[in-house]
Amino acid sequence: EISMLSAEEADQVGVAAVPPQVLAAKALECRPLGNIGVAYTYNEPLVGWEYVRDTARLVKDNGMDNILVTNGTASLDVLEELLPFIDAMNIDLKGFRESYYRRLGGDLETVKRFITRAVKDCHVELTTLIVPGENDSMTEMAEEARWIASLDAKITLHVTRFFPRYRMLDREATEAE
């Protein structure tokens, strides 16, 4: 549960800020071990999009790749600043109903615009976590698949299972079928 640590707890477990220059240098140092670049992931990396941009620029200057894993809830201006440095993205598409996104504190249209723009210049894969009773209707899933295919029929959609955790213990795991 590292994402839920307070600043004091983070200090106790040794969480530290890593400047862009240090991360880019470490990525390059690990190249002989097979490292190809940096993936910006866990929590939401675009909360600190300037850090991603600054680091990705340095990583790209070193001839390495940048992969962004995001919820796609960022402005197109931010995306435009990042695209020259990002080689691939995995974007969470949490469902295909505006009401579901609103309950999660997001906006489906913002995410759709982000995805639509990203696929024009970047390798994009999408991930949808199927939550029972929330975004698991065949109608919604078919509508989502049609929309994705309308952008590019070759976009990979990863469909993942939900498991009850943290504040969502009130439902069962997604069935494997």
Give the label of every model feature segment.
Residues 3, 171-177:
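Short, intrinsically disordered, charge-balanced linker/junction segments flanking boundaries
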Residues 46-53, 57, 102-125:
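P-loop/Walker A phosphate-binding loop and immediately adjacent motor/lid segment at beta-alpha junctions
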